[in-house]
């Protein structure tokens, strides 16, 4: 039997949801939780009949009164009616819009400005301020009023205001839980994750299924980031997630297991079970996800299918033909052998699982991948797990939010809507979300912003912990001294998948002496905000395939924050490991401290060549490095052997003064030569 939501029925009857809920409980003994609850059509029709009867009798009475009054003064009433009709039209428009908002407005904090509540009530600022004055409150447009006052004000305009509590904002699952009854559910496509050890042929297998060459475009044949693809098979769609197979990306693979219905575990027939294969099996068991084993590379000379099945039994996976319940399909991504059998098993398994979703509800799902695109801004790949997502919808994703400006399918085509089990790429988010974040569709962007801001504030509070400054070069000493108990890291990368991979690998480096903690991970260039966070939390910033901007460089030098950038993920891991063991060698750079022009040359037999020079810039210091430059070309590089001011030895001579000097192991100084003095200074390594 069909159902209708309370707010929809209230809109049809032109009454508030609160009034309708009261009516349902008192007149019909129907208990409803809130305006999003659904009631039977039969009850809805009875309510319509009841209220339409009342309205009809009231309307008849009003019309009789109106006829009587009009007869008394027809000309005056005619003019009044014209004005009244205009007002009624205007009010009707407002009421219609209010009905769409279900007669309920919400506050996300303890206070609200007069401007905000005016917009929510769809009343002019003057009307609202006037009502406040009548209530004894003098307030300007930008002044805030508390919840109690806002509640009274809303009642004046026949509206009700609700304050969203923390639980409701944080647990959107409860808000979006309606209409999960069997009658609303429809069959959906299975979501398949392909897992396995590196080089066992995961992407090649997907390539064989999709009949498109993806492997050749990926560096070293390794999938760098999670991709989501939809393929058609016998009129049915199957969505594939491809997770990277390397051990460093365990976090990404685990995230894939949480959104998938069936896992295809790819095992090479000539290699057997490997470390990443074991991890994949663990993730599947932990997530209670069905598993199909694809024994790949059966065309290889050393292929041994029975050996693979034997190894699988050690992990509790017994093949069907060995009396177990694990589906094992021998395949060859190269020759396409067994591909059809594998696809048939996927469809068979999905039928047994009876996968269903409700496409007519608000959308929710998971962020598969996210990145910052130079031309398009924050871009996120979403996997819709329930409901239908449309262009123009407002969503909240972790601590970010947005209104969908554009949506693309896995083939890059622009689409207007997408249903359950569909991967889409969206534009319009305020920031780059975290991979693995849940997304929820909400009524309006303002609601999404309120929820996101609250979450962001909570995260920010967790970050701000102030301790001693740390750098990789002196990390070991600080650990030995006991001043460092926790190494905080801020990780920035070009894509979210890399952030998670680094985070997972770095946190494994924790020891008894020091705990490694990634306090923040994000996508995009290293900015001043990251440096501020590192300053407050005594952290080190690690960049992977990204660079710090100018403001970040200035701020890091000012605050003494260590920034390291890398292009290879394992170099970052090795540097942290070496620093913790006290083996990281510091990096040095040359700093020119001054230049001098040779104006006169003296040759002394017992000493050598002495140059009389004038300091042009900076200063010259004894025992500093020195190079002789003639006509822009470096002639010789050594050290200052001596430095004198008149007849006295000098430690240094400043700009604007003359001095006598000699160069270690060099006597061919000529007038007009430039002596460049420099020192080697230890620096924080900025790049490899």
Swiss-Prot record:
Region of interest called G3, as start-end residue ranges on this chain: 242-245
GO cellular component terms, semicolon-separated: cytoplasm
Annotated compartments: Cytoplasm
Keyword line: Cytoplasm, GTP-binding, Initiation factor, Nucleotide-binding, Protein biosynthesis
Domain of life: Bacteria
Region G2: start-end pairs: 221-225
Residue segments, region G4: 296-299
GO MF annotation: an example: translation initiation factor activity
Xref: PROSITE patterns: G_TR_2 (PS51722), IF2 (PS01176)
CDD domains: IF2_eIF5B (cd01887), IF2_mtIF2_II (cd03702), mtIF2_IVc (cd03692)
Region (G5): 332-334
Main location: cytoplasm
Residue positions binding GTP: 196-203, 242-246, 296-299
Region listing for Disordered, in residue ranges: 53-100
Bias type Basic and acidic residues, positions: 53-62, 86-95
Residues covered by region (G1): 196-203
Residue ranges occupied by any tr-type G domain in the UniProt entry: 187-354
GO process annotations (BP): tRNA methylation; tRNA wobble uridine modification
Record-linked HAMAP family: IF_2_B
Task of the protein: One of the essential components for the initiation of protein synthesis. Protects formylmethionyl-tRNA from spontaneous hydrolysis and promotes its binding to the 30S ribosomal subunits. Also involved in the hydrolysis of GTP during the formation of the 70S ribosomal complex.
Family as reported in the entry's similarity comment: Belongs to the TRAFAC class translation factor GTPase superfamily. Classic translation factor GTPase family. IF-2 subfamily.
Protein name per Swiss-Prot or TrEMBL: Translation initiation factor IF-2
Organism of origin: Clostridium botulinum (strain Hall / ATCC 3502 / NCTC 13319 / Type A)
Gene that this sequence comes from: infB
